[in-house]
Amino acid sequence: MAALASSLIRQKREVREPGGSRPVSAQRRVCPRGTKSLCQKQLLILLSKVRLCGGRPARPDRGPEPQLKGIVTKLFCRQGFYLQANPDGSIQGTPEDTSSFTHFNLIPVGLRVVTIQSAKLGHYMAMNAEGLLYSSPHFTAECRFKECVFENYYVLYASALYRQRRSGRAWYLGLDKEGQVMKGNRVKKTKAAAHFLPKLLEVAMYQEPSLHSVPEASPSSPPAP
């Protein structure tokens, strides 16, 4: 009872004198605006490292990254002409090297296999089952050419799809003495018509072209004007 009475008396004194018997706590410091306390900084660092369970960091919506290393080049034929792809779809040789229609992308699409794309038009060079060269808006199996370095350091481009049935001789890309494209089955690898010298303009990265089906009737290259 005495202890209870003394406790009641002590409580009454605390009510009458609130600051009398309580220890004075240190006054809380208020951080000025624009600054963060050490605890706040640590909390922000901790939250920045927290990953939600089952979640992944957001990635920007990007297209597929280029993975193929090729070159932008001019193809100079030993006959004295630069290979040129014209806007009307025709392919021919020209003695002038200033035209942007002589710029081609050489994109690797297999082991020693490339596709030859017009850097200006975006069309692919193709050879059909008759050995005729034409320009295709889509990448097909007829747009694949085997690349081979000849003994004189010129490069040969042979159709990766077609060749002579009996002898197995390759069909080559070639220009005649007038700069006109030749049928692949009439071009011999030992002749100047098939010898091309790539003149590097720049190295570039490319996306792998999407393969389309070969059309039932592959168009041939229209005659050059």
UniProtKB/Swiss-Prot annotation:
Region entry Disordered: which residue ranges?
1-28
Q: Which UniProt keywords apply?
A: Growth factor
- Which GO cellular component terms are attached? cytoplasm; nucleus
Q: Does the keyword Methyltransferase apply?
A: no
The record's annotation in InterPro entries points to: Fibroblast_GF_fam (IPR002209), IL1/FGF (IPR008996)
- GO MF annotation terms: growth factor activity; sodium channel regulator activity
| Annotated function | Probably involved in nervous system development and function.
Protein name in UniProt:
Fibroblast growth factor 11
Which organism is this entry from?
Homo sapiens (Human)
